[in-house]
Design a protein with these regions (language model features):
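Alpha-helical subdomain
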Residues: 53-54, 58-227
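Conserved Class I S-adenosyl-L-methionine-dependent methyltransferase catalytic core
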Residues: 1-63
Length: 227
């Protein structure tokens, strides 16, 4: 097996070499491990939730689609902050199976429609805003463009896409995203991106990046409009 140093130099992912298939395909075949992963991602959402909902006003969107939203922890917090909005939680069947309990716990289940599917195939239509938290950083550019292309197909003109990500800043100081950038590269041949890189990526799919909203946490909200 290649060393991590060689993986960094070549840009090839470790997990396919170790497990014989990409990370998310491997998780799909390992339900116990997938549960640990999904619970961990819910925990990561908890780190970002308060800062994201404090920094960004979701109340102007009637329908919010959480793409790759896992168990729905972020969507639940968004709907709590936007009491007149409704949500669509979209993720793989084995992932959203556990969502009703969490949504009920947070008293938003009656305002959420759960849709099963893969964002590589299609994304639910009808959203005013499409939220993707820690989705795009999991994928190299070609796959990221495919995902965002499906979001653009679902979204009408002037609708919004909101990427909640660790946006690499323009400084050399310590930043969490610089560590996860290396993790994404070694694990998935993916990476964290700067604001400029997100702007270029979004423009390839018919979005115009309008702003990057920093939060009190390391996460930022990259806002773009479908054109």
């Amino acid at each position: 097996m290649e060393s991590p140093h060689r993986r960094i130099r070549t840009g090839r992912a470790v997990i396919p070499a170790l497990r014989g298939k990409p990370a998310f395909e491997y998780l799909a075949d390992q339900p116990d491990l997938a549960k640990i992963f999904n619970d961990a991602m819910t925990g990561v959402s908890a780190l970002a939730i308060a800062s994201v909902t404090a920094a960004y006003d979701f109340r102007r969107f009637a329908t919010i689609v959480d793409v790759g939203g896992g168990l729905g922890r972020l969507l639940a917090a968004i709907l709590d902050a936007a009491p007149n909005s409704r949500g669509v939680l979209f993720d793989l069947p084995q992932v959203v199976a556990g969502a009703p309990a969490l949504l009920s716990e947070h008293h938003v289940k009656d305002r959420v429609r759960i849709v099963e599917g893969s964002f590589f195939d299609a994304v639910p239509e009808g959203g005013d805003a499409y939220v993707l938290k820690n989705v795009i950083h999991d994928w190299p550019d070609d796959d990221a463009v495919r995902i965002l292309g499906n979001v653009r197909t679902a979204a009408g003109t002037d609708k919004h896409v909101l990427l909640v990500e660790l946006v690499i800043p323009r400084h050399d100081r310590e930043f969490l995203g610089k560590w996860t950038d290396m993790e994404m590269l070694i694990g998935n041949a993916a990476r964290e991106r700067s604001a400029v890189e997100y702007g270029r990526l979004l423009s390839r799919d018919g979005f115009r990046m309008t702003r990057v909203v920093q939060t009190a946490s390391p996460f930022s909200v990259v806002e773009a409009t479908a054109i």
